[in-house]
Amino acid sequence: MVKIAVCGAAGRMGGRIIAAVKEAEGVEICGALERPGHPMVGQDAGYNAGLGAIGVAISDDLNAVVQACDVLIDFTAPKVSLKNLEVCALYGKSIVIGSTGFTPEERALAAELAREIPVIIAPNMSVGVNVCFKVLADVAKILGEDFDVEIVESHHRLKKDSPSGTAVRMGEVVASALGRDYNKVANYHREGICGERTHDEIGMQTVRGGDIVGEHTVYFIGMGERIEITHRAHTRDMFSRGSVRAAKWVVTAKPGVYDMQDVLGLR
């Protein structure tokens, strides 16, 4: 039985992960974390998950929770995730990170810490999205240089980072397949008289509004034809189920940084 702890247990995603753990076989929820001073600290974690009491209180003691688990699932923010990763490395525990918005320096620090423990860092835990990553790489290689690439992503009005980590990953996948450096060809800004589109650039557009869970479309635009590859998320449950699947996988992995492509055997 894999013992799972959840960081951000009082949030929307944390609640869905706890519910997914309770539904899954071979795993159990052993800990729930929140920041010190959060009003739900001390309350049963099952209430936020819509389950009623499950006998696991939300705690603000990171060290104690990590020591008691086999793997920590973290959907918070980069700085919090890195702190959690440091503590997991200290105690030899695995971690699954779904936070987005990491800087290159933060990614480098995560890779350094992953020399001690297996770490999954994935901008999107959905099986469907990760299949899309595979499809995008294949399509980009087939189409080559004859099609322009544009990405449009849409999320709810409360999302803090832009563009989404999933959209950036899609851009990285396409750029790599085309032999380009994503950081050099990504275009996040078009306004006024900005000149014609360059051949290599990958455009990125963001929509924020309402309660959109997540939608990503990659356009391959040629002369006289267009291919659109779209993934739409209707609920957060696919992310929570994916994170539990990742947690079950990572506890048997060797130290290093992995993502959902590894979990799903898509490499």
Swiss-Prot record:
Protein name: 4-hydroxy-tetrahydrodipicolinate reductase
Active-site positions on this chain: 155 (proton donor/acceptor), 159 (proton donor)
SUPFAM superfamilies per UniProt: Glyceraldehyde-3-phosphate dehydrogenase-like, C-terminal domain, NAD(P)-binding Rossmann-fold domains
PROSITE patterns reported for this sequence: DAPB
Annotated localization: Cytoplasm
A GO biological-process term: diaminopimelate biosynthetic process
Transmembrane segments: none
Domain of life: Bacteria
Pathway: Amino-acid biosynthesis; L-lysine biosynthesis via DAP pathway; (S)-tetrahydrodipicolinate from L-aspartate: step 4/4
